[in-house]
Amino acid sequence: MASKVDSSHEFPSQIKRCLSSSKYIQLATCFHDQPHSSLMTFTYLPAGSAAPYEVEDCIILSTGENSKKYFNISSNPRVSLLVHDWTTNRQETDPDASSLYTLLYKMNQAQFSNTSVTLNGLATVLPKNSKEEEFFREKHLNTNDKGNTKQYVEGEDMRIIKIKLESARICDQRLNNVQKWNARGDETPF
């Protein structure tokens, strides 16, 4: 697979697009060399949308105080996240739709269903009952107000976690390409 480094500090559009179109993200935490992975609902906040608390792009998650991920993050704030757009490719078309519509729909979905992004960052459990926690909880609720996901944001023991993004690997299957990004502009080793 070809690989290139994005030397700019700007958050790549492929990552923004993938984060904006996905509902779930895979969170990986670690404690004493024992990894743990969780499928999570999340909120992506582009740079500037979380002022005055955050100026850069960030991701918001929530978890219970008694969860393994909460314990792991409290002990080791380094996390990895995986997000992809493949799920859009599995949506069924309307059985009553015309064959032209079905063809165009499938072609359109195929264009979007080839990217996966691995993000690395530092997770911070926000101070309980702080204005910052209230601010980010509200943003997270606005994203997760449908169905049963709201229960994972509200609640006495639910904590809000902010992840500052440090680096990423963007894999594009169509182009057999891996692009690397680093918030500081440094070259990432992997």
UniProtKB/Swiss-Prot annotation:
InterPro entries: PMP_oxidase-like, Pyridox_Oxase_N, Split_barrel_FMN-bd. Keywords: Cytoplasm, Flavoprotein, FMN, Nucleus. It is found in: Cytoplasm; Nucleus. Binds 1 FMN per subunit. Coiled coil: none annotated. FMN binds at residues 62, 69. Its cofactor is FMN. GO terms for cellular component: cytosol; nucleus. PANTHER family: PYRIDOXAMINE 5'-PHOSPHATE OXIDASE YLR456W HOMOLOG-RELATED. This is Pyridoxamine 5'-phosphate oxidase C1952.08c homolog.
